[in-house]
UniProtKB/Swiss-Prot annotation:
It is an enzyme of class 1 (oxidoreductase). The keyword Transmembrane helix does not apply. One of its GO terms (molecular function) is 4-hydroxy-3-methylbut-2-en-1-yl diphosphate synthase activity (ferredoxin). Transmembrane segments: none annotated. InterPro entries: Dihydropteroate_synth-like_sf (IPR011005), IspG_bac (IPR016425), IspG_bac-typ (IPR004588), NO2/SO3_Rdtase_4Fe4S_sf (IPR045854). It catalyses: (2E)-4-hydroxy-3-methylbut-2-enyl diphosphate + oxidized [flavodoxin] + H2O + 2 H(+) = 2-C-methyl-D-erythritol 2,4-cyclic diphosphate + reduced [flavodoxin]. It comes from the Bacteria. Its cofactor is [4Fe-4S] cluster. This is 4-hydroxy-3-methylbut-2-en-1-yl diphosphate synthase (flavodoxin).
C-alpha cells in the first residue's frame, strides 16, 4: 500500500582496494560517499593531512588531482604518509589532458592510486584521442585498477558534439540543442566505456559519470544513462555552488535520482566558504543518504524549529552542542560502539511535541518553553528516567547520552 524509494538499479560491482581496505561501488554494495582534496598535490604532507581529515569524516574514497609531473611524483609519498598514519582510504587519481604521460612516466604513482578518473573530453584531440585514451586504459589493466570514465558538460568532446549537431540539423524534425547535448554526454560515456572493454578492461572495472551543473539536466541525463547501460554510476553536479544553494541543488538532484534507484556513489561538489573545512561535503553526502534511509553514518539529532513558545535559545544551543559532540565522537565510536550510527536523539523546545518526540527517540529531552515549569524531563527508550534543572542541563544531558552509548552499543553488550 505504501512505498518508499524504488528498487536499486542493477549494476556491475566495481572493487576499489588499498591494502586490506575494500570499497565496492555498485552491485549490492551501499551507495558510497566520496570527496576530493583541494590542496596542491605536490605538497605531499598537506595533501595527506587533508585526505586524513576527509577519511575521518567518513569519506570512503578520496580523489586527488594528478596534473603535473610534480604531483605524480608526490603520490607515492602521500600514500606512504597515509599508511603510516593508519589511513587506508583508497586514493583516486584525477587526470586531465596528460594522464597518459603521467601514468607512463611515473609507475609508482600508477601503482599507489587505487582508481583512475579519465575524462574522454580532454584525453586528447583528433587522431591522438583514441591512442591516448587507450594508453590510460592499458595502464589500468597493467596495474589492475578500476577507472571512472567521467564526462563533463564543460569539457565535452567537441568533435563528437559537432558531428551530432550536424546530424541533428539533417533530421526532418531536429531535436532541441539541449537534447543533443544530453545525447552527446551519454554517447561519450557509453562509447568510451565500450572502447575500454574492447581494449580488455572488464565491465567490473568501470564506473561512469555524466556531470552537469543543472538539477533538471542531471536528472534527465542519468535517467537515460541508467536505462542504456549496466555500468556502476557516480552521481554529482559538476559545480553545486556555495552554502545553502549548493546543498539544496545537490540534495534535489541526487536525492531524486537515488529515490528512483539510480546511483552507486556520490560526491557533493560544494564550494567551501573561506576558512571552512573541506569535510563539509562529506557530511552533506552522508546526511542525504541517512535522511533518505539508505545508510546510517552518525546518530541523528531531531530538534524542533522553534516558535513563540520557545523564546529561550537553550534548546537550539543544546541541539547544536549534542549534534557536534556526536559527530566528533564518531571516529572512535564507529569501531568501539557498532550500531551507534542508528541512534536517534531528540532535543525539543516545549511541551507541545517535546515529550512525544522524546519518547520516540532513543534518548530525548523536552526543554521548558516560555512560561512552562523550568524543568526538562529526559526519556530513554520511551521511558521518563530523570528531570534536569538548573544551569548544567547541557553537561548533564551530554553525559546521559555518553553513558547510554557505552551501555547500549558496547562490544560486550552487542555480544550478549
Amino acid at each position: 500500500m505504501f512505498g518508499g524509494h524504488a528498487p536499486r538499479r542493477v549494476s556491475h560491482a566495481v572493487d576499489v582496494r588499498w591494502g586490506g581496505t575494500l570499497v565496492t561501488i555498485g552491485g549490492a554494495a551501499p551507495v558510497r560517499v566520496q570527496s576530493m582534496t583541494n590542496t596542491d598535490t605536490a605538497d605531499a604532507i598537506g595533501t595527506a593531512i587533508q585526505v586524513k581529515e576527509l577519511a575521518n569524516a567518513g569519506s570512503e574514497l578520496v580523489r586527488i588531482t594528478v596534473n603535473t609531473p610534480e604531483a605524480a611524483a608526490a603520490v607515492p609519498a602521500i600514500r606512504e604518509q597515509l599508511d603510516r598514519m593508519g589511513v587506508t582510504v583508497p586514493l583516486v587519481g584525477d587526470f586531465h589532458y596528460n594522464g597518459h604521460l603521467l601514468l607512463r612516466d611515473y609507475p609508482d604513482c600508477a601503482q599507489a592510486l587505487s582508481k583512475y578518473r579519465i575524462n574522454p573530453g580532454n584525453v586528447g584531440q583528433g587522431a591522438k584521442r583514441d591512442s591516448q585514451f587507450a594508453q590510460m586504459i592499458e595502464a589500468a589493466i597493467k596495474y589492475d585498477k578500476p577507472v571512472r570514465i567521467g564526462v563533463n558538460w564543460g569539457s565535452l568532446d567537441q568533435d563528437l558534439l559537432a558531428r551530432m549537431m550536424d546530424e541533428n540539423g539533417a533530421r526532418a524534425e531536429p531535436w532541441e540543442a539541449q537534447s543533443v547535448m544530453y545525447e552527446a554526454l551519454i554517447q561519450s560515456a557509453i562509447g568510451s566505456a565500450e572502447r575500454a572493454v574492447e581494449l580488455g578492461l572488464g565491465r567490473d572495472k568501470i564506473v561512469l559519470s555524466c556531470k552537469v551543473s543543472g538539477v533538471q539536466d542531471l536528472v534527465a541525463v542519468y535517467r537515460e544513462l541508467s536505462r542504456r547501460c549496466g555500468f556502476a554510476l557516480h552521481l554529482g553536479l559538476t559545480e553545486a555552488g556555495m552554502g545553502s544553494k549548493g546543498i539544496v541543488a545537490s540534495t534535489a538532484a541526487i536525492g531524486l535520482l537515488l529515490q528512483e534507484g539510480i546511483g552507486d556513489t556520490i560526491r557533493i561538489s560544494l564550494t567551501p566558504e573561506p576558512g571552512a573545512p573541506r569535510t563539509g561535503e562529506v557530511v552533506v553526502g552522508q546526511e542525504i543518504l541517512q535522511t533518505m534511509g539508505l545508510r546510517s553514518f552518525a546518530p541523528m539529532v531531531v530538534a524542533c524549529p522553534g516558535c513563540g513558545r520557545t523564546t529561550s535559545t537553550l534548546f537550539q544551543e543544546l541541539a547544536l552542542r549534542i549534534q557536534t559532540y556526536l559527530r566528533e565522537q564518531m571516529p572512535v565510536w564507529r569501531s568501539e560502539y557498532p550500531g551507534v550510527e542508528k541512534m536517534n536523539v531528540a532535543v525539543m523546545g516545549c511541551i507541545v511535541n517535546g515529550p512525544g518526540e522524546s519518547k520516540h527517540a532513543n534518548i530525548g529531552i523536552s526543554l521548558p518553553g516560555s512560561g512552562e515549569n523550568p524543568a526538562a524531563p529526559v526519556f530513554v527508550d520511551g521511558e521518563k528516567v530523570k528531570t534536569l534543572r538548573g544551569e548544567h542541563i547541557a553537561e548533564e544531558f551530554q553525559q546521559i547520552v555518553s553513558d547510554y552509548v557505552a551501555r547500549t552499543y558496547g562490544r560486550a553488550t552487542a555480544q550478549n
